[in-house]
């Protein structure tokens, strides 16, 4: 199925919160993929930077409760939001200062902007049926993914088990991985 069958204008770059609403409005996997390709082709950097912030498990903001906007503000620029998120990631903004800053951003942003875009980034859930796998498969801009390598069952490779070998039992359980910066 081509992107044109979904009436997607490839020359028009949408605002990120409108893209999220478009993605959540349809359950069609093919349409979601077409939308991701359209935005990738349009090089919608703001959209993919926000998606990266939301879907990258290595990026944490240290915020538990993010308010929902109930009134329109004058609008919040992406640059201002990204600046504050950077401070949250580095833990330069914590406690009451963090809460007050997030509340201030919520008041300044439009309801659409905040509830459908910025808030979803902070809670790390875009709620539109798109995962990092979809983004990475259909976009030139990738979201970092970390997956733990699992052990293979040797029963599938019995012919390779010749000569002297060192064998350890395959155990199921919790893996602990430490990342030192």
Show which residues each predicted segment covers.
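N-terminal nucleic-acid-engaging modules of covalent nucleotidyltransferase systems
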Residues: 1-181
